[in-house]
Amino acid sequence: MQLEKNPKTRNLYRRLLRLGDRVTGASFPKMKRVKQITVFHCGPAVIEALFSFLGVRVSQTGVVKSLRAFKKIKRIGLSVKDLARATHALGHGKYVFWKKANSKISDIETIITKYKFPVGVEWQGVFYEFEDEDNGHYCIVTKVDREGGFLRLSDPFHAFSGIDRKLGIKFFTQRWWDTNLVKGRILKDRRMLFVVVPQGQNWPKKLGMVKAN
């Protein structure tokens, strides 16, 4: 974590992570590591990446266009509900957006290891010298290592995209929340996770997830 935090050692640290991935194999190699096109587009970038894992091409602009949210995304960003609506529209009803609040790390681990899907999360991102007043962020968890006490995150933010980040599980869990402005009310999402799966796959229901399309 300290190596990533320090701008002087960050590039070396990222090269070491990349080397490790080449040796052991990166998780979900079929999934595109997407860079968000603006500071507002972390949600659309995550949807683009999750669809890429399924072999479906969508764009971040297409996500925003499907919601007619060009002004909204710059003002308050996109909610999980918005991402679900975009998934339904761009997937033409062939894919389902499942979500679960108040999740556990074990839920993420089960989805990755048993069901073999990457997991979207809504959390308080860590940007270091790029920090701004709103740290609400979307990323994709690609690996959970209980023994090592860390997880790997595909982060679309420009400084971290391309190589999955490595964060301590405890550190991530403390930041696994976000707030959203919905109809004038501020609502807090706690430990929100989500996946995009083909229509007809109902295993997310076994984990207490709900369809959000």
State each model region's role.
Residues 43-46, 79-86, 104-108:
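Stable alpha-helical elements in mature extracytoplasmic
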Residues 78, 87-100:
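Mid-length scaffold segments of soluble, non-membrane domains
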Residues 2-9, 71, 132-133, 144-213:
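Noncatalytic regulatory segments and standalone regulatory/sensor domains
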Residues 56, 92-93, 117, 209:
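Short aromatic/hydrophobic-glycine micro-motifs
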Residues 1-77, 146-147, 199, 203-213:
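Active-site-adjacent structural segments surrounding the nucleophilic cysteine of cysteine proteases
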Residues 101-158:
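Active-site-adjacent substructure of cysteine-protease-like catalytic cores
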